[in-house]
């Protein structure tokens, strides 16, 4: 879809991982990632790094969708992840929502849910607002 193509263009890692975009508004970004053996630990659990990449991508998209006027982009400057459950199959969904939108930082909270809708991770991150250099 067009949203997925847009996300892949802005963040090429999302294409490499196979992340898809289901929704993109300033209020909410929804990205999905399918479980794959190539994204797992040796025991078949979706790797925490893959989950964090999904969450960081969702958070970055949410920050970008809320950029103040005159800003050129964002960059993650802080991220905290709580893993609450293992993912052994199916699709995981990241839903990112802004908690604070300011002129210099944007704070995003992202929930990661498994295919049954169970919360398996929660991420809070701060994005710095980038401005063009004179």
What is each PLM-predicted segment?
Residues 1-134:
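Terminal targeting signals and extreme-terminal segments of soluble enzymes
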């Amino acid at each position: 879809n067009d949203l997925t193509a847009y996300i892949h263009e802005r963040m090429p890692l999302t294409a490499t991982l196979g992340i898809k975009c289901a929704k993109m508004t300033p209020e909410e970004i929804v990205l999905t990632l399918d479980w794959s053996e190539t994204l797992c630990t040796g025991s078949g659990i979706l790797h925490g790094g893959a989950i964090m990449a999904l969450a960081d991508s969702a958070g970055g998209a949410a920050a970008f969708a809320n950029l103040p006027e005159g800003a050129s982009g964002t960059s993650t400057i802080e991220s905290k992840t709580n893993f609450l459950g293992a993912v052994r199959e199916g699709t995981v969904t990241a839903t990112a929502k802004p908690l604070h939108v300011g002129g210099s930082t944007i704070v995003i909270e992202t929930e990661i849910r498994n295919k049954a809708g169970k919360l398996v991770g929660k991420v809070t991150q701060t994005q710095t607002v980038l401005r063009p250099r004179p």
